Amino acid sequence: MGSVADDAEITGPLLAAAAGGGGDSAAAAGVERVPAWREQVTVRGIVVSAVLGVLFCLITHKLNLTVGVIPSLNVSAGLLGYFLVRSWTAVLGRLGFVIAPFTKQENTVIQTCVVACYGLAFSGGFGSYMLAMDQKTYELIGPDYPGNRAIDVMNPSLGWMIGFMFVVSFLGLFSLVALRKVMVIDYKLTYPSGTATAMLINSFHTTSGAELAEKQVSCLGKYLSISFFWNCFKWFFSGVGDSCGFDNFPSLGLAAFKNTFYFDFSPTYIGCGLICPHIVNCSTLLGAIISWGFLWPYISTKAGDWYPANLGSNDFKGLYGYKVFISVSVILGDGLYNLIKIIYATIKEVMNARSKQGRLPLVRVHDDDEGSKLSAEEKLRNDTFLKDRIPSWLAGSGYVGLAAISTATVPMIFPQVKWYLVLCAYVVAPLLAFCNSYGCGLTDWNLASTYGKIGLFIFASLVGRSGGVIAGLAACGVMMSIVSTAADLMQDFRTGYLTLSSPRSMFVSQLIGTTLGCIIAPLTFWLYWTAFDIGNPDGMFKAPYAVIYREMSILGVEGFSALPQHCLAICSVFFVAAILINLLRDVTPKSVSKFIPLPMAMAVPFYIGAYFAIDMFVGTVILFVWERVNRKESEDFAGAIASGLICGDGIWSVPSAILSIMRIDPPMCMYFKPSLTS
């Protein structure tokens, strides 16, 4: 990702070109009619959004419950939305029906609705704070573990999960909607992902862009089919349990396999490697080498000295405890640094905006000729964005009303959380939502999980041992939902601004998508919950962040007394190292900093294992070579191939879950063992 300044400089010309092709340039502004906001929200769009919402929720859950690494699927949502509606109109057109034209505004609304829907599969905590409350996570940590009490257990249930989603997921939409003009027009925040999505959608609705989109859809469908049938083929050899098949193929040897170094032929993680930046994939592999190549083998030699030698592989008093807490320390160090960095940048830019009397953040001073070329189109975008206002009284009363309902309802779901604590959270939340949304606009980083962890620690420590664990986890959910949805909404406003979409249609689309997500996300999670062994540390669906979040909540209640010997010292070293590495990335020149690893990406394999890092590295090597051979082709089709690989794997999870529910086991078990020696 380039710098924010770079984004601000290139955005205008590129969008002008894309819009010009579609008839949105200044010259064509009087010819093309921008649809009314009600025409942008269509029945077919809602149906397509619901279908894609199910697919992307399945994908998000699978990634959440396996490794916890979720790439951005916004481009995939826009591309598949374009394909499905185009197919819809083509079929009905051949049947003789009169079909309304498919506009870029409708495409934007669909993409917004899908992202709002599957975003709740992440911010809903189905692989983190919500799952951390269940019986299995409690038992995995151990009933005799300090602070881990049996009363702090709440198993997943569709009733309370859907109810909780409805009472907390809408507040973020109302918290900052009144500031949309300030953030998008006045401050001209770039929201790089939102800008990239707008450029993509604009390109779809040009002649050349439509041709490329058709090729991308064809490519996506091809690799989706390959991924689906490959997973089907793998299933026949996966046997009963989690120790058979290609997922446990010792491709680097049996010794490396014992330390989780193997290639498991996963299309999903290869696809993630194609989508994620090279530095993320390389950082993940480096973290795997440091932890599973050196650190864990070294600590394991201290069995009987630092910790009892006869403990199980998942006992927190042994090596397992080091794995979890060192991962937590790196994640917290990285999150704390970036939180302080974003808040500092936010305060600095706001103060500069005030002191310079109208010179706003991220405004590039264009030459007069360039400014005159873009001014007419920018005026059209501004007029469109400001035409369909969302009344401030609606935003304010909506937030207050929803906060009142949530304040009364959340304690009914979680009795450990008192109403006045929920109220305090909703008083502070808009400020945190602004910080996160502004920071996301500057850097493209959504730090919702970091704000959630802060709420977790504060509430867990305030409530104490009498229910603090559940209270902290629930508070994490409240904060994450508000902060995450507010940033997503503002990013979607940026996309809508650049595609001449009405802010009112974008807001309605977010409401519809959130409503769908409150139902679809729990239902798709329930499919996994009933079909697979979720939370088994030796299985496929490890749910790594469930254990991490519960341990953080226990840490907020108990302090550091529960850590194994020398664990606090090692955690402190890694916590400081995460901060220093981030600082080094910021103070060194870009030519150097691009090679410095990301601590957050390094932390993930510390707990999960090295296998997925190898898969992602395979993806990044493929992309690297492809970029050297044909950069234009890689830019056009790498995302489509990655999306196909990920989507095919996600679709396979449905028949796989059905087979599991019906107790139909694979017919063969393929496994490996050392050769017999004399």
UniProtKB/Swiss-Prot annotation:
Per the record, the domain of life is Eukaryota
Keyword match Transmembrane helix: yes
Tissue expression from the record: Expressed in roots and leaves.
Q: Name one Pfam family in it.
A: OPT
Transmembrane annotation, as ranges: 41-61, 65-85, 113-133, 158-178, 226-246, 279-299, 324-344, 394-414, 419-439, 467-487, 512-532, 561-581, 606-626, 641-661
- Gene Ontology molecular function terms on file: oligopeptide transmembrane transporter activity
KW Methyltransferase (keyword) present = no
Q: Which UniProt keywords apply?
A: Membrane, Transmembrane, Transmembrane helix, Transport
Compartments where found: Membrane
Q: Which GO terms describe its cellular component?
A: vacuolar membrane
Name the membrane topology term: Multi-pass membrane protein
Give the UniProt family note. Answer: Belongs to the YSL (TC 2.A.67.2) family.
Q: What does this protein do?
A: May be involved in the transport of nicotianamine-chelated metals.
Name recorded for this polypeptide: Probable metal-nicotianamine transporter YSL6
- Can you name the source organism? Oryza sativa subsp. japonica (Rice)
